[in-house]
Amino acid sequence: MKILLFICGEGLGHTSRCLALGKEFLAAGHEVSFGAYGYSRELVRKTGYSAWEIQPEIRLIGETGIFDIGKSIKETLRNLSPVGFRKLLKLIEVLEPDVVLSDGYYSGILAARSRKVPVYFIGHQFNMEEFFQKKGPLLAVAGKLVRRFYNYIFSSVDGIMVPDYPLPYSVNRRNFTIPRALNPNIFFSGPLIRSRYREVEAKAFRHPNVLSTIGAFGYRAAIFRKVLEAAKLDPDIHYTFIAGPGIVPEQFPEIPENVEFTGFTDNPFPYYRGSDLVITAGGHGTIMESLAFGLPVLSFPDEKHTEQENNATVLEDAGYGKRMSYLTRPEVILACIREVLEDENYRRKTRRLMELAEVLDGPAAVRKLLEEKFGERSAGKENSKEET
């Protein structure tokens, strides 16, 4: 079976789960191609795979922790071009995939449909109209147009893969609004994680160890500064900071002795395995990785980023962690860290999610689904080529 994976480059979560799928398909003897751009393409190549360059699509803009939908729309429209779309069509013609998997990359879906190739949408956010609400009449109209577009996308694909725990455990459940008629096409795969818990050797840290990740946005440096201040208040709690592509360690002077600043890593899983708690933004990918490794989460969602705020709310409501704020003071951050570390109920619930992730084995579940649907089709294509 020949699989083409298109990757949205906004946030590393899309890339990480596509790498998990690519690893699974390749191990099973299938042929995999990646289409990506920006630092997502760089990460694919650092992992050891080749990646075709595709045009950028969605671009998220924000300052000081506040998501700006207006600027994001302008940047997204600036990225799109007919030339880039024609390159997608040509890429599909050259690679001749049996199926296209498009993770948050809508142009890839349109190109696959145009070439009559089966295509699946991978995503966790299904209520984008919320981003446009209460922001004036023009953005309200834009939101309705966006809703019509993504409803068309959801109804035109061969299936929708949700890289989350099935209900009632799903973290994205507040972002999940799809017409009931599409239910037969929806598949909750479980977390798509590159490394399974039992396969990872833990980093050797002093405990308790708090792992802080910043993702891909430089403006989230505010989280680091607040957490650094919290770290100074209790030297008995140890911290490991993993920076994103937009952050350099030199931005943070006077790092206390109980803090290790590692810079960016393309393999965070030993850090998860060796830690007791994760501090992150509200991105779905990092939250899934944390929960799949049994870790409670303190989530700092970007303000006005509805999807992230919903994720963080579910974390708190379900007892998997706490929803934080960029306004939270260091003293309160420390109080929340202590509460989550000391209250066994948090760890008990997230440990259950770790066990569930192992049972679900998201990448294998997706592979088996596609093998059942397209395995025979792929074999038929090869036989046809040999006969000609």
Curated annotation (Swiss-Prot):
InterPro entries assigned to the protein according to its UniProt record, in alphabetical order: Glyco_trans_28_C
The EC number on file is 2.4.-.-
Q: Which UniProt keywords apply?
A: Glycosyltransferase, Transferase
- Coiled-coil positions: none
Tell me the superkingdom of the source.
Archaea
Q: Kindly list the GO molecular function terms attached to this UniProt entry.
A: glycosyltransferase activity; hexosyltransferase activity
What family does this chain come from, according to its entry? Belongs to the glycosyltransferase 28 family.
The name this protein goes by in its record: Uncharacterized glycosyltransferase MA_0453
